[in-house]
Amino acid sequence: MTHRIAFIGLGAIASDVAAGLLADAAQPCQLAALTRNAADLPPALAGRVALLDGLPGLLAWRPDLVVEAAGQQAIAEHAEGCLKAGLDMIICSAGALADDALRARLIAAAEAGGARIRVPAGAIAGLDYLQAVAGRDDAEVVYESRKPVAAWRAELPGMGIDPDTLAESRTLFSGPAREAALRFPKNLNVAATLALAGIGMTRTRVEVVVDPRARGNQHRIQVRSPLGEMQIELVNAPSPANPKTSWLVAQSVLATIRRHLARFTIG
């Protein structure tokens, strides 16, 4: 069976995912993309990914699955229409879901259309553990994001920090996951994913650190409850095309697509 998969956005993550799908002969796919600029299409995907004109064009193409990888604004513009039309979605820009009103609208749209929303793990691990303790009022979750200067180069000047002279680590934010995800939409999707899987946007605590000595994009997750403790530390290689995100993210999205299409899954 050939699956029809449409992307919203065709940046670094979506391009890597599309290439992975096209290379998988065991799971043939037809691909299309809704993108603002046809020049975004990498040469390796030219002629292999159909370009769609707006949401009407996407709906007319009738995909089996829609993968959003274009940022939080794209979710506000397109997700509700896709879900109402009955199209299952994978949402990569999880930070948008920190907005309770938007999240409620998307869930209502999915219910109306009989669609499902999936959020990939992305750059992190341990979501199954967080889901297991989600209902406990006595659970504590702390997440630390520690990334090198390259991941924050565009934002640091606006915070009064010179990225070229920064020699020591600096804490950029300390507070609840909701505020972190909405304040830093290009860097903190992970915070929203953790909070949605676990104890919520308010109780999940987030520390954001820029560190010129960081070995890649580092993620530390600590969970404590009477059920036990979990500590996870990941050191992910940055994406060659976008240092704000981990190279692992595209593979996580690809794995989520394969689970969505599979008859047999684990986890």
From Swiss-Prot:
Keywords: NAD, NADP, Oxidoreductase, Pyridine nucleotide biosynthesis. It is an enzyme of class 1 (oxidoreductase). Its EC number is 1.4.1.21. One of its GO terms (molecular function) is NAD binding. Pathway: Cofactor biosynthesis; NAD(+) biosynthesis; iminoaspartate from L-aspartate (dehydrogenase route): step 1/1. The active site is at H219. InterPro entries: Asp/hSer_DH_NAD-bd (IPR005106), Asp_DH (IPR002811), Asp_DH_prok (IPR020626), L-Asp_DH (IPR011182), NAD(P)-bd_dom_sf (IPR036291). It catalyses: L-aspartate + NADP(+) + H2O = oxaloacetate + NH4(+) + NADPH + H(+); L-aspartate + NAD(+) + H2O = oxaloacetate + NH4(+) + NADH + H(+). The iminoaspartate product is unstable in aqueous solution and can decompose to oxaloacetate and ammonia. This is L-aspartate dehydrogenase 2.
